[in-house]
């Protein structure tokens, strides 16, 4: 069993990563339904919460069925982060996660996200202040370091633990790498193998297949996997990993009919939550993966991603179901 503070999780839990414009309540709920053990919100600006910015506040919404859920916030000003904690607490999440890993320039330029990797003392002080300011468990998501020459993740993780961080998720790249090259899980294993570490250490980055997840568990010895891009438009990924763990066999993927029905549910949930316009527009990014590998699909996909009218998108789903039915997508490669 793995525990984040008092939250009990199964051995080697699978966590849905916080992803901007992806990890919203509808998608999180679908991932939870399909095997995710913990889900995290999109990252939320502490300054946006303080200003009561509509987009930031909307990200605080939680469905009861998706628990345990962590709300992730980012910022570099301790006072602003503490004020945002008070706002977050009112929505009753299970966990508050601090984003010390986002590599995007507009975040880093303000010293937030991965930008704080240039100031480890501030990173630790901010974490300590937040731990003291709330009774909710504080967790951290970060990267190996700012660049290859500044990787001190073993020391950093221990310092975060010592000020009260209850779990740490580490992406196996530096900020300088962004998302290029391959994630290196070896430094994450060094964190886990530090005899002074006793909080869960979760790996993140390039967990793209059930086999890779098993490698993270069995070869690298981590406590769990945080899964991001592999789940976009494919919430089945979590159950497929768990099936592979139990049997050593790959679970047959969903039929085209099942994929279409999931996409339909996803769109309807998004509309119910965000309204028609945002629901239609922001669900589009999932369709490539929902229907990846279907031959001669371009015409159907264009209808899904170009129409602003949900009736047209639902009609496109109907045509796909009528055309392909319960067929399986041909195995690629």
Residues covered by each model-derived region:
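Flavin-dependent oxidoreductase catalytic cores
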Residues: 1-333
């Amino acid at each position: 069993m793995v525990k984040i503070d008092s939250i009990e999780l199964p051995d080697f839990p699978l966590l849905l990563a916080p992803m901007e414009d992806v990890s919203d309540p509808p998608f999180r709920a679908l991932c939870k339904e399909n095997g995710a053990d913990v889900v995290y919100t999109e990252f939320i600006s502490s300054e946006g919460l303080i200003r009561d910015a509509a987009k930031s506040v909307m990200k605080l919404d939680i469905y009861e069925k998706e628990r345990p859920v962590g709300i992730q916030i980012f910022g570099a000003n301790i006072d602003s982060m503490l004020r945002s904690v008070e706002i977050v607490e009112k929505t009753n999440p299970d966990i508050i996660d601090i984003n010390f890993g986002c590599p995007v320039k507009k975040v880093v330029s303000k010293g937030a996200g991965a930008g704080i990797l240039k100031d480890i003392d501030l990173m630790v002080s901010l974490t300590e202040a937040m731990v003291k300011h709330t009774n909710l468990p504080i967790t951290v998501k970060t990267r190996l370091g700012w660049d290859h020459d500044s990787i001190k993740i073993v020391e950093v993780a221990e310092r975060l633990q010592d000020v009260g961080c209850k779990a740490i998720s580490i992406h196996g790249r530096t900020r300088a790498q962004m998302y290029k090259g391959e994630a290196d899980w070896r430094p994450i294993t060094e964190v886990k193998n530090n005899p002074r570490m006793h909080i869960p250490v979760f790996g993140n980055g390039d967990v793209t297949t059930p086999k890779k997840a098993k490698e993270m568990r069995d070869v690298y010895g981590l406590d769990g996997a945080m899964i991001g891009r592999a789940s976009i438009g494919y919430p089945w990924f979590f159950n497929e990993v768990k099936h592979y763990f139990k049997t050593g066999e790959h679970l047959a993927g969903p039929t085209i009919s099942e994929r279409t029905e999931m996409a339909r549910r996803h769109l309807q949930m998004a509309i119910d939550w965000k309204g028609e316009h945002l629901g239609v527009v922001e669900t589009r990014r999932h369709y490539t993966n929902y229907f990846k590998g279907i031959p001669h699909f371009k015409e159907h996909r264009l209808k899904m991603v170009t129409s602003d009218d949900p009736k047209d998108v639902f009609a496109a789903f109907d045509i796909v179901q009528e055309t392909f039915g319960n067929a399986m997508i041909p195995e690629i490669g």
